């Protein structure tokens, strides 16, 4: 039996609730656990395997730009993915609403892709803040060690 509109509303509502809950928990853990912790070593290659810090330009500016882009893309995917899915299904002659199984997986993917981009954007922003704070501490330490001139 095809999926009814009421079932779609329930599935989408539950999925959005789970996505927002996961995003809130992730943001809280970033703050409460202070990830990445400045006492621990942070390996860019492990934590951000697709980010190349040697590609040129200021790392903080690029991280903040990439964080914003990921968050914007995550928000845009919430609206673009259903359109693409419907277009692709019609193009291939499939019915998205024909199977509960297809609908569940489609809605799960629809929410997982934006959620992963939101989380990536938050993490990159947090890393940019960590680097900014570290630079400020280093500049303050150098300024404190600078020779003082008597006037």
Feature-to-residue mapping (PLM):
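Long, highly hydrophobic alpha-helical transmembrane signal-anchor segments
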Residues: 1-24, 90-107
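Alpha-helical transmembrane segments of integral membrane proteins, especially early/N-terminal helices
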Residues: 1-2, 30-40, 78, 141
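Alpha-helical transmembrane segments and their membrane-interface junctions
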Residues: 2-5, 69-93
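Transmembrane alpha-helix/helix-exit interface in multi-pass inner-membrane proteins
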Residues: 17-43
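Alpha-helical transmembrane segments of multipass membrane proteins
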Residues: 22-26, 77, 81, 85, ...
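Alpha-helical transmembrane segments and their immediate juxtamembrane interface regions
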Residues: 31, 89-136
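Juxtamembrane inter-helical linkers in multi-pass membrane proteins
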Residues: 35-59, 133-148
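Membrane interfacial helix-start motif at the N-side
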Residues: 54-71
